[in-house]
């Protein structure tokens, strides 16, 4: 009972409480500090831990450059093996030939082709007869996938029976040419051999130019919408396919916005633009031009800044701007084409366009500046000599290193082919021109076809929305021909992507058995099943954050490009080759791709915590957007002991120097230049962005050969120490099973220690390691499957040995822990091992005793409605050791016991009459934690901590001058960021806190009320806290929705229309595929919501910087306050403008050795209504604001940073891409649609209207 506990607390402090003045905040804080340090010392056994470690390890100051090189070589070896597997698949495919059987669709023939469908999960199919009857034949399956959880695929269910084949929705899966290519690509034997050689080999892929994708091992398909079986995926739009299939390119999209581009045409044009953008990778650059009577480039600088890198951030930004333009007037090609070439080629000099009437009215010397004149049908183009020379020399230097220049023209027709313009700008045909004629009734084919055919391009007719996806890929096929012809030039050159979220790893919806009748006896089974489901969801959540890079090779057969062979590599595996256990606890590795964008970084937050989608800018973040500046001081060069401030030409503070800083740091890292390392003062943020910690980093970098990545290392000041084993060679024969016999230890769930067999999903990571440990003990050497991670395994064994007697030590403190309501102690190590000790408190239940199963009939197996239980701080909530929030906090506050409160867990009182520490009858208590980093001098050994019932805090504070009471004397404990750890307001509710509606606890102190706001300002003014400003460059903002109204009486029937039109579109596409024709007509009703994959998610948000102030404890600062009084002379403060009677005195004192600050606010005797918001409201002009707000910058035209990709070292020449057989055909021609299709469409059209 809580009364008994309180008596124990009173007895414990009987000698102490009589020896200090409870009216003195300084003495109260001092005694509280001594108590907390004594308690932590007894629980952590810090002295014993250090003694244990000193027998096994020694401290070492490591060389960052040497450690970085070791990690670099490990990563290179790892990536090289994956690259070889992809190359092996390429060679195997190129040695095969495509069959030419004519009976591949005849189930009675031996040549009948089956394949394992990714969407169906078997090899069954439906064949549609290619005749006027349109009959279909159902072919039953002979094989199906038996998907089982795979231990080496992060428990994702896979099948090794065969590879799976995915076919995009617009393609007919029984097209004979498609089937022959699917059969040709069946190299499962190669895939299987590769997989057997390397346990942690991820998905092996092949994407065909025909559109299908084969992947091994098979896994169920991830639908974009599971309920509707919506599938937007096409492997030909992936970065790994685009990189290998085409040269890198500079692309200018010209979008006709003339008056005829209205309604359906414009919607098709927008969809075509999206589809083109979908095919651009980070190695490409682009801009979009709208033209009618005027021309506009959609970037913020109207083209003066040239082309933008094709990041998703830039693509979505320009796509949004398209919606702000309307169709009007005439399409002025004579204005648009010269501007397009000027921007695309970055031409120097100038030109002007005059009408013929304007030219005739000018004087003879009016155009002396322009020495060149070209007469066009409606204008005269006048240009300077510099401009003409620039054209003849191939343009300026703004092509950013891309290989090809491309114009994409989207129009419903052109009045002229403008041969003179193309002859002037593109005489050598170095610029490809692709034309997309949109609209089902478009008839002006000849002019746009001539533009494409005369300029190494291709023309397609995009009749309607159903046409878009497949028609777009004609341009890629056209550009891939040079890859086929010149493939020998690249040799064994591999292509690597940046980071992306692999859809094959994404969690699929779980399917559960039908509910069974609920009985009194079934609730235990129900709870157990709910617990297992919780574990499965945790694992699937981990997979949802699976990001990969992919290595790929083009597959060429007889100089014909056939597709791309690839292997993807989870970045969590790559990161373990540069393991955090090898460096200091505050230091970290990071990796950049060939474009300089961040791939891995502890501050990268790629997933939006609310939508669970990846952010638009997740794979195009610059390093300095994550290394957020701490203050105005920017340091450079460590060659001398005195670190000098960086002085910029533009100024001397951070804001003015940011551009110079970006160039200096980024150039050093991209160039892998460690000769003059850079140092920055930065803010390290926790994952939830509720805490930031200042630290000074020194940066080092190494280039990863072949992949063109950059591996970086940020070493925090004073953090270049680690522990290493005393033995040069670890003796595995000394491994004892007793070290792990108690089962109260856990390993990092995302780190591999030893490889497993695919089928070892029935055992936990800990159980598997015990088996390997037994083999070590028996044989005296490391098992083969542990050799790959030997260094980490040795560190783990050292931690296990050093902490093996902790359980016994914790046993000796059983009574002490019980009396102080401590029910959990733990120690987390850099090797990822956490050892813990559980103690069940007698007066508390760990499963909700007030829950009744009969209240939740119908919710069987639902976590939310299963009987609630205690969420274990380690086994349920914090399994990741060094990656967990508490660990990262502890190592950044050396020699400090950190106190925190958690709303993720609770325990229940056994007695229904027991009251909380605040005197409320709520049946439960929340939990608090204390933790601290343990050091062997300067090197971290781990983080020790314990968890306790929060009632103990309330009772302890009552004995240190702060009993729960009214607001006459308000006592609070603030943590290092001024969040409230304890408040003595007597109406604080645990239940409210646990559902996010609590009062005071865990809230920012300065935002509670006007009194707290003023007190917080004084805490900053008196140097208890330092004000910091953090900019979140990864934030997202909600886009303002444009609301439109319509009086259309048919609007309620739109869902029906949508279904009918989708059904009709499918039938026509199917008939078109079977007949080999092309779709050129559909009724005019189209529902034009974006369905292109990359533009399907997150359309209501956009990337934006957000900024917030933070307040960091100055307990170790140089200007630590010398008095406890927040107002000079301990005078009263009157913070309420509307209430002159409110008068308070404010005091504060650090609780030494902890992260806490004790604050007392005492009302004078005559003081009234200080906490009544109607009489004492918060100040609008807040001196201590807190909370993220969007940084509203005026839109200015700033030059984009020029990024030259390291991936563009090889460019295939297009000079010979001009032969007759290559140029003809250079377009798709419309074919007559069957009478049946037209009649059916007209019938449906008139039925609707």
From Swiss-Prot:
Q: What tissue expression does the UniProt record report for this protein?
A: Decendants of the cells AB and AB.p (that give rise to nearly all non-pharyngeal neurons), decendants of P1 (that give rise to body muscle) and cell lineages that give rise to the adult and juvenile motor neurons. Expressed in body wall, vulval muscle and pharyngeal muscle.
Q: Which SMART domains match?
A: VWA (SM00327)
Drop me one GO molecular function for this one. Answer: calcium channel regulator activity
GO annotation, cellular component aspect: endoplasmic reticulum membrane; plasma membrane; voltage-gated calcium channel complex
The residues that carry sugar chains are 100, 140, 146, 302, 520, 558, 757, 838, 903, 923, 1130
What is the recorded membrane topology of this protein?
Single-pass type I membrane protein
Q: Which residues lie on this side of the membrane: Cytoplasmic?
A: 1249
Q: Gene3D superfamilies recorded for this chain?
A: PAS domain, von Willebrand factor, type A domain
Function, as annotated: May act as an auxiliary subunit of the unc-2 voltage-gated calcium channel which appears to trigger calcium-activated signaling pathways that control the serotonin response. Inhibiting serotonin sensitivity of the vulval muscles results in egg laying defects. May act in both neurons and muscle cells to enhance motor activity as it is required for coordinated movement. Has a role in neural depolarization-induced calcium influx and pharyngeal pumping. Involved in restricting the expression of the putative olfactory receptor str-2 to only one of the two AWC neurons.
Describe the location of the VWFA domain by residue ranges. Answer: 250-479
Question: What phenotype has been reported when the gene encoding this protein is knocked out?
Answer: Worms exhibit a weak egg-laying constitutive (Egl-c) phenotype and slow irregular pharyngeal pumping.
The alphabetical list of record keywords is: Calcium, Calcium channel, Calcium transport, Glycoprotein, Ion channel, Ion transport, Membrane, Signal, Transmembrane, Transmembrane helix, Transport, Voltage-gated channel
Residues of the signal sequence? 1-19
Q: Which GO terms describe its biological process?
A: egg-laying behavior; locomotion; nematode pharyngeal pumping; positive regulation of locomotion; protein localization to synapse; regulation of calcium ion transport; serotonin receptor signaling pathway
* Localisation per UniProt entry: Membrane
InterPro entries recorded: Ca_channel_alpha-2/delta, VWA_N, VWF_A, vWFA_dom_sf
Query: Which stretches face the Extracellular side?
Result: 20-1228
Q: Name the species this protein comes from.
A: Caenorhabditis elegans
Q: What is this protein called?
A: Voltage-dependent calcium channel unc-36
Transmembrane stretches, start-end: 1229-1248
